[in-house]
């Protein structure tokens, strides 16, 4: 009996769950219920209300957060638009200020600020060429967008016939962009011009050390004038009145560039006139022009006849002197004396006795030597050639005597000339000094 009571007590109190609301049932051994069912239902309804309130609260919080985020995003967008507008305005004002300053000061360090604004907008750095290409493409896209906006604004204005403020802003912005670009191009062109002017070396007429060749000293003033800077400029211009002196061994096609090409190499030129005594060893003697007389007029004609018929020279001379009644020996002595007293250097001058000058006289001294002579004649006119003085070979025993300078004594004039090669006599009465020299030249030419 006691065991039965104990089991009933243990099972009398248990927990029963109904729709999430715990219901406690009490029973005793007699079977009485501990709690009414109405209290359980009230508790269940209260719990349901509380749960619904919690759900409403969570949804309200979520809606509030969503509205706040949307509001924040809208405000952020508006602030960003305002910042971009202010930045564009600042860039435009700065560009205008720089344009004014550059026009006043002509400064070359101008950098357009449009690139800086684009860099700040797109977060680009111009450290690499790829970044520069990127920035250029972005600027092209922006310019295209601006053009499209301007065109669309124009179409809308045409449709509505109402001037829009937005169109004016776009036009002004495009205008200032073009102005900045043109200004940048002008500054870049000026900088390139200055750089090219520094690189380009002007052509300065450099006086190259050159001297006139020794064999071309007949007209030294004319030849030396070719090497002056003005003459060089005339030659380079292609003037036909001046002919350039070219080095030997060059063709006609290289005459224009031969003188300039020599300045590029290390060429040793002959010494200048002011650097060496070599070119001034012999003073230049002015040539004395004889007056035009009947004797000088017939001189060339007689020389041609003497060259053609040298054997008839003595006969012609004797015949002419016999016609006039003059002794040939006395006339020769008088001619030599008169020549020595008047002009010893001019040995070819014809000196005839006083008398009738209308008669045809013959010059007994030839004008010039034959062209086949290997050495210049000693009685040639005094043409000074600049160069080292070389002693002439003298075929006489006495080396101190010179044939060029005649002696004043009559004994030396009457002394016959003797050839040292063939021992042939040349008396002064029938032969002249030119005949003796021509005879010596035949020995050098190998004729005898």
Curated annotation (Swiss-Prot):
Q: Name one GO biological process term.
A: negative regulation of canonical NF-kappaB signal transduction
Q: Which residues cross the membrane?
A: none
Q: Name one GO cellular component term.
A: protein-containing complex
Q: Which residues form a coiled coil?
A: 60-98
| Gene name of the encoded protein | Tank
Q: What is the official name of this protein in its record?
A: TRAF family member-associated NF-kappa-B activator
Per the record, which residues fall in region Necessary for interaction with TRAF6?
105-224
What is the recorded function of this protein according to its Swiss-Prot or TrEMBL entry?
A: Adapter protein involved in I-kappa-B-kinase (IKK) regulation which constitutively binds TBK1 and IKBKE playing a role in antiviral innate immunity. Acts as a regulator of TRAF function by maintaining them in a latent state. Blocks TRAF2 binding to LMP1 and inhibits LMP1-mediated NF-kappa-B activation. Negatively regulates NF-kappaB signaling and cell survival upon DNA damage.
Map the zinc fingers (UBZ1-type) to residue ranges: 416-443
- Return one GO MF term: deubiquitinase activator activity
What keywords tag this UniProt record?
Coiled coil, Cytoplasm, DNA damage, Metal-binding, Phosphoprotein, Zinc, Zinc-finger
| UniProt region (Necessary for interaction with ZC3H12A), positions on chain | 35-65
In the record, Phosphothreonine modifications are located at 246
Q: In which tissues is it expressed?
A: Heart, brain, spleen, lung, liver, skeletal muscle, kidney and testis.
């Amino acid at each position: 009996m006691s065991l039965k009571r104990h089991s009933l007590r243990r099972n009398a109190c248990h927990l029963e769950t109904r729709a999430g609301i715990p219901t406690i049932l009490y029973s005793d051994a007699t079977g009485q219920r501990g709690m009414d069912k109405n209290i359980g239902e009230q508790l269940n309804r209260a719990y349901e209300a509380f749960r619904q309130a919690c759900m409403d609260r969570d949804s309200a919080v979520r809606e509030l957060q969503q509205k706040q985020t949307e509001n924040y995003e809208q405000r952020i967008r508006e602030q960003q638009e305002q910042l971009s507008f202010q930045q564009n305005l600042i860039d435009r004002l700065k560009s205008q200020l720089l344009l004014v300053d550059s026009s006043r000061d002509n400064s070359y360090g101008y950098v357009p600020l449009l690139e800086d604004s684009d860099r700040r907008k797109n977060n680009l750095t111009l450290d690499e060429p790829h970044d520069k290409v990127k920035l250029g493409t972005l600027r092209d896209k922006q310019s295209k967008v601006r053009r499209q906006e301007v065109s669309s604004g124009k179409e809308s204005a045409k449709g509505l016939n109402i001037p829009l403020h937005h169109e004016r802003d776009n036009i002004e912005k495009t205008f200032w962009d073009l102005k900045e670009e043109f200004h940048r191009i002008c500054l870049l062109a000026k900088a390139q011009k200055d750089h090219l002017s520094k690189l380009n070396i002007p052509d300065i007429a450099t006086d190259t050390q050159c001297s006139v060749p020794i064999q071309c000293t007949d007209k030294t003033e004319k030849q030396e004038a070719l090497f002056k800077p003005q003459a060089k400029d005339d030659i380079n211009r292609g003037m036909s009145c001046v002919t350039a002196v070219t080095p030997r061994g060059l063709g006609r096609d290289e005459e224009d560039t031969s003188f300039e090409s020599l300045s590029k190499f290390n060429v040793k030129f002959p010494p200048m006139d002011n650097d060496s005594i070599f070119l001034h060893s012999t003073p230049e003697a002015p040539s004395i022009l004889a007056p035009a007389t009947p004797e000088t007029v017939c001189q060339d004609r007689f020389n041609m006849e003497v060259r053609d018929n040298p054997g008839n020279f003595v006969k012609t001379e004797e015949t002419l002197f016999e016609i006039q009644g003059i002794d040939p020996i006395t006339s020769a002595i008088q001619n030599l004396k008169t020549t020595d007293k008047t002009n010893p250097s001019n040995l070819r001058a014809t000196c005839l006795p006083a008398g009738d000058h209308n008669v045809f006289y013959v010059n007994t001294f030839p004008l010039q030597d034959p062209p086949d002579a290997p050495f210049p004649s000693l009685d040639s006119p005094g043409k000074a050639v600049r160069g080292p003085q070389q002693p002439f070979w003298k075929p006489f025993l006495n080396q101190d005597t010179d044939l060029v300078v005649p002696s004043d004594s009559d004994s030396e004039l009457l002394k016959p000339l003797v050839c040292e090669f063939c021992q042939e006599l040349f008396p002064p009465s029938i032969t002249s000094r030119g005949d003796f020299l021509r005879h010596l030249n035949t020995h050098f030419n190998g004729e005898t």
